[in-house]
Amino acid sequence: MKIGTQATSLAVLHNQESHAPQAPIAVRPEPAHAIPEIPLDLAIRPRTRGIHPFLAMTLGDKGCASSSGVSLEDDSHTQVSLSDFSVASRDVNHNNICAGLSTEWLVMSSDGDAESRMDHLDYNGEGQSRGSERHQVYNDALRAALSNDDEAPFFTASTAVIEDAGFSLRREPKTVHASGGSAQLGQTVAHDVAQSGRKHLLSLRFANVQGHAIACSCEGSQFKLFDPNLGEFQSSRSAAPQLIKGLIDHYNSLNYDVACVNEFRVS
C-alpha cells in the first residue's frame, strides 16, 4: 500500500514500519489496521486461499513509500545512487493507485519527454484520472478473483488492468526471487526487461506481503523505468542492472525488503 507523505514526513503503512529510518524524516503513522502474520510464500507466489478478502485487498499493488522527503543519494545500505539515473523526480501516487498509474505510463511511454509524461500523470494531468480509472479495473478484478477463490488473484488483477489498457501478455507472468541479494535480482530482472522493444508492468512484492507496481520500457539502447512514488529514471541498457538494483536498495533501506519481482511482459 501507499504510505502517504507530506513535505518532509514519511507515514507508516498499517503501523508495520515503526523501525523505518528516523533521520532526516519524521515518521507519522497512519491509522493502524492490525494485519495478522502471513507466510512469506504469499509474497513469492501470492496465493490468497484462506486469507480474509479484506486483508488480501490491502496487499494488492497500491504503492508503498513515497519519495517526498526521501533522499535518493547513496547511504550505508546502497552502493548505487538512484539520483544518477533520475530524469524527472516526481511523486504522483498520493492517491494510492500505482498499478493504474504504471499502466498509464506504459501507454504513453514513447510520447514526449520524461517531464511531459510526469505532467500528464500528475494531479492536474489527464493521466491522473485515467490512472485512477485503470486502478479501479485492477481493484474490481482483484475483488472478483477473491470471490472466485482464485489461487493467484494478484496475477489476475494485473492481467486485467494490462488488457483493459489495450495490451496483451507476451508470455506467462514470471516471478524472480531475491534469494541472491539485490545485485543478483537487479541483474536477473534486467536480463528480461532491458531488451529493445520490450515493455513490462512489474510488481515488487515485499517481505511484509505488500505490493507496489512500477513499469519499464526499453527502446533501442535506452532503458526507462517509472515508479509512481519516485518519478522516471533512464539508463543505457548495459546500466539497467545498476538502476534496478538502486531501486531495490532504496526500498530495502526503508525496511521494505523486496522478496521478489513479478514480471508482466506486454505488447
Curated annotation (Swiss-Prot):
GO molecular function, one term: cysteine-type endopeptidase activity
Transmembrane spans: none
GO biological process, one term: symbiont-mediated perturbation of host programmed cell death
Outcome, altering G63A: Abolishes the localization to plasma membrane in host cells
Signal peptide range in chain numbering: none
Enzyme class: hydrolase
Highest taxon of the lineage: Bacteria
Function of the molecule: Cysteine protease avirulence protein, which is essential during infection of plant cells from cultivar-specific of beans and Arabidopsis thaliana. The autocleavage of the protein is required for virulence function. May act by affecting the plant defense system. In plants lacking R3 or RPS5 resistance genes, it probably impairs the plant defense system and leads to the bacteria multiplication. In contrast, in plants containing the R3 or RPS5 protein, it is unable to induce disease symptoms, explaining its avirulence name.
This protein's name: Cysteine protease avirulence protein AvrPphB
Organism encoding this protein: Pseudomonas savastanoi pv. phaseolicola
